[in-house]
Amino acid sequence: MSQYKTIAESNSFIVLDKFTKYFEVNEAPAIYQTEAALEKEFIQDLINQGYENPTNLNTLEAMLANVRVQIQSLNNVEFLDGEWTRFVEEYLDKPSDNLVEKTRKIHDNYIYDFVFDDGHIQNIYLVDKINITRNKIQVISQFEQTGTNANRYDVTILVNGLPLVQVELKKRGVAI
């Protein structure tokens, strides 16, 4: 086993002077790598870094249910079904919001004052920007999106259940 020198360390992370990819240690080197193999390697690297890899998130309904679980966990709250529907319609996936307004929710307006059915008001966070380790990071593959444009992304990274990064992988040597 190689010896590594620590460059920086905190309670949340560690930076070492050298990084060896999982596949380099555990697999024979491949001369030709398919796009599927590249995707598998990328996902495994993310899993090795602590990302969860739920395999049941293949429909819009499953994604929305996952967002609910993650938002409830982040905010230490339990939504009733009616409250969750209202939260989604009033704020999270407001029908009148365009792409820019939805993006602003993550960057600027990521805290929403939600009034629960019993009358109490609570700040609901989409992401925790102060203590980032509280955010749940997940990676899924081959999620199909329908709508005005039907897309299927190779890898999608979810932050608290929200699809914030979509990656389209290409095998080496192929012009894009």
Regions found by a protein language model. Name each.
Residues 1-176:
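An alpha-helical interface "stripe"
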